[in-house]
Amino acid sequence: MIKLVLLVAAIAIFGTGFITVIINQFTSAKNIIMDLYNSDTWLIWLFGRMAVLFSHPLMLTISSLYIVGFIVSKTLYS
């Protein structure tokens, strides 16, 4: 029971930060995509822009959320 309370508290504390970071990164990713569409020579810049998009912190955040979810599920169901 105590472990569950600590887990919920940790998720609440880190969750608010995660949500803010994810919103900022979605906005940044959206700006990159909009730049792609608004560019006249977008075929020339496509590979450079896609490289920026795929090295985007959003990808890192998604993978770290999977890791956090895995740890949480292991803690709850062990």
UniProtKB/Swiss-Prot annotation:
Topology versus the membrane: Single-pass type I membrane protein
Q: Which residues form the signal peptide?
A: 1-29
Membrane-spanning residues where?
A: 52-72
**The keyword Transmembrane appears for this protein:** yes
Q: Which GO terms describe its cellular component?
A: helical viral capsid; host cell membrane; membrane
Where does it localize?
Virion; Host membrane
Regions annotated as coiled coil: none
Q: What is its main location?
A: virion
Kindly state which keywords UniProt assigns to this record, in alphabetical order: Capsid protein, Helical capsid protein, Host membrane, Membrane, Signal, Transmembrane, Transmembrane helix, Virion
Instruction: Relate the protein's function as given in its record.
Output: May self assemble to form a helical capsid wrapping up the viral genomic DNA. The virion assembly and budding take place at the host inner membrane.
The UniProt entry's sequence similarity note says: Belongs to the plectrovirus ORF9 family.
What is said about its interaction partners and assembly?
Homomultimerizes.
- Name the UniProt record assigns to this protein: Putative capsid protein ORF9
Q: What is the lineage of its organism?
A: Viruses, Monodnaviria, Loebvirae, Hofneiviricota, Faserviricetes
